[in-house]
């Protein structure tokens, strides 16, 4: 699972494009009156890369109603497929002009991979004494890792639903 996107890039299946690098919910500017996303902020991580990392991270962040800091409630974490549909509809409605067939092919993988990868990063940091991610208490990064692993489990549980959402949106060009 860990190499799926990099392998696709190496095989020439996914092109490099400009990516944000940290498109979590906190980095999306929301218009106060409409509640609509109007801009992405915090541009210090912009670079050439695979847009799948951005899409996966955005969905990881935006489809976990309990958030990254669910802490001891980590067992209640789930992937919200309704949020997934809404986010992907909005994204694809704007990005359809440059998305290629393989972009859609690897969307599910990107969603699952980013949650799993972040879980590994939090867990590794916990084992190393919380030296990378700031921790409010000794088990903070352990709980953060459990949140991401539970989210990964939920993403895998909803695999068929997520793939159907992607297929529906692609067929309707983001207009579902």
Regions found by a protein language model. Name each.
Residues 23, 30, 83, 107:
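Active-site capping/gating regions of soluble enzymes
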Residues 99-111:
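All-alpha amphipathic helical-bundle segments outside canonical DNA-binding/catalytic cores
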Residues 117-176:
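ATP/Mg2+ or Mg2+-diphosphate-binding catalytic cores
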Residues 12, 26-67:
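Catalytic activation segment of kinase domains across protein kinase-like and atypical kinase folds
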Residues 1-7, 43, 61-64, 93, ...:
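Conserved helix-loop functional segments at active or binding sites
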Residues 52-96, 113-132:
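Active-site activation/catalytic loop segments of kinase-like enzymes and analogous catalytic loops
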Residues 15, 20, 47, 79, ...:
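Secondary-structure capping and boundary motifs in well-ordered enzyme cores
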Residues 1-21, 31-35:
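An alpha-helical support segment within catalytic cores of ATP-dependent transferases
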């Amino acid at each position: 699972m860990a190499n799926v996107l990099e392998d696709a890039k190496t095989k020439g299946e996914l092109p490099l494009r400009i990516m944000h690098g940290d498109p979590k919910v906190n980095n999306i500017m929301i218009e106060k009156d409409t509640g609509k996303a109007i801009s992405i902020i915090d541009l210090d991580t912009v670079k050439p890369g695979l847009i799948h990392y951005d899409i996966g991270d955005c969905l990881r962040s935006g489809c976990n109603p309990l958030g990254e800091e669910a802490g001891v409630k980590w067992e209640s974490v789930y992937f919200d497929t309704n949020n997934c549909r809404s986010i992907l509809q909005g994204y694809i409605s704007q990005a359809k002009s440059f998305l290629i067939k393989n972009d859609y092919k690897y969307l599910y993988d990107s969603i699952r991979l980013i949650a799993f990868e972040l879980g590994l990063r939090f867990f590794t940091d916990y084992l190393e004494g919380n030296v990378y991610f700031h921790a409010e208490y000794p088990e903070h990064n352990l709980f953060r890792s459990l949140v991401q692993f539970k989210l990964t489990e939920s993403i895998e549980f909803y695999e068929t639903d997520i793939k159907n959402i992607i297929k529906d949106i692609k067929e309707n060009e983001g207009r579902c």
